[in-house]
Amino acid sequence: MQVSVETTQGLGRRVTITIAADSIETAVKSELVNVAKKVRIDGFRKGKVPMNIVAQRYGASVRQDVLGDLMSRNFVDAIIKEKINPAGAPNYVPGEYKVGEDFTYSVEFEVYPEVELTGLESIEVEKPVVEVTDADVDVMLDTLRKQQATWKEKDGAADAEDRVTIDFTGSVDGEEFEGGKATDFVLAMGQGRMIPGFEDGVKGHKAGEEFTIDVTFPEEYHAENLKGKAAKFVINLKKVEERELPELTEEFIKRFGVEDGSVAGLRAEVRKNMERELKGAVRNRVKSQAIEGLVKANDIDVPSALIDSEIDVLRRQAAQRFGGNEKQALELPRELFEEQAKRRVVVGLLLGEVIRTNELKADEERVKGLIEEMASAYEDPKEVIEFYSKNKELMDNMRNVALEEQAVEAVLAKAKVSEKATSFNELMNQQA
């Protein structure tokens, strides 16, 4: 076997391989012997068919199969010998083949980039220092009460946290537009569902009033014909409702799994959940900064084959989220996922190099801790932990999470890490 390697462009490689004629003939004869042992031909007992007849009947297909097998095996031998690490599936380009002659073919593929990590000492990470205060717990309790609130009709004017029922008709330059009209539309104020200025125009009005408001569609509005356009909405306000928050009664508190039904018990449970969320948020915030710094400090080429593979993964995930199938996933435009896919590949390659150079292996104690932390959010943590322990795929996924955390910590060990006092609300809003 003769082998030559050339760089086509960037990470592209072409390996040209020549297989000696005698190697091909030896392999063909060997395979024909195997065929002769199995084949049945009228007039001959199984295994007793003359080789010339076997060769005449099956020689062409056997030779084709042998060539395909030799091409694959010799390519593997070649990349091992040349210490090449292909990324993605190789493209075989067969040359002209004549029986009795050497056979030359080429294989085109991309290789993984050679990554040499630099600039870790220049990475700057700001670690949030946060504690859950009594005031934070008060806000969360208020949020829980709002989620369980009922609505009661009121006579007064609509304000920022009310719910209104309206009819409206929108127009641009005196002409109604598609999607600009609704009847008995229920709008919970303060959630930002409508275009800027709409809710402000409703505030201060009472049920039974009809009025007109002026608004401007944002430049980034999804409908091309309405972007940046001034519009008028004629609104008939039919009903105004205000929230009635439930009292912190024993019955209400027990809905959240607090068995003793006490306010103190609820506050303790809420604080515990907030602290768990906080721990994850701090970890994610630090991790995202470390990875961002790692990416900025290390500009690497990325094999297009890996990007293509990641795009397929993202397409399928998107289709699953919206109830689509395999065919619909493949029809989603490549451009929607290309940037995210490239980013994920880059991060994977860089963290992989961190893991390799630091000789990291998943810490089983960390894996156990991650599973316990995740399970604590469920009603029966022991059941969740047992489920994970019996599922190899889930355990492997959690080991990957742990290994990634360890890689990030290795980056942080060399980075410039400072601390910044932050409120719970500020940090959680950054995560949103």
From Swiss-Prot:
Its EC number is 5.2.1.8. It catalyses: [protein]-peptidylproline (omega=180) = [protein]-peptidylproline (omega=0). GO terms for biological process: 'de novo' cotranslational protein folding; cell division; chaperone-mediated protein folding; protein transport; protein unfolding. Residues 161-246 form the PPIase FKBP-type domain. PROSITE patterns: FKBP_PPIASE (PS50059). One of its GO terms (cellular component) is cytoplasm. It is found in: Cytoplasm. Keywords: Cell cycle, Cell division, Chaperone, Cytoplasm, Isomerase, Rotamase. Signal peptide: none annotated. GO terms for molecular function: peptidyl-prolyl cis-trans isomerase activity; protein folding chaperone; ribosome binding. Involved in protein export. Acts as a chaperone by maintaining the newly synthesized protein in an open conformation. Functions as a peptidyl-prolyl cis-trans isomerase. HAMAP family: Trigger_factor_Tig. Consists of 3 domains; the N-terminus binds the ribosome, the middle domain has PPIase activity, while the C-terminus has intrinsic chaperone activity on its own. Belongs to the FKBP-type PPIase family. Tig subfamily. This is Trigger factor. It comes from Salmonella typhimurium (strain LT2 / SGSC1412 / ATCC 700720).
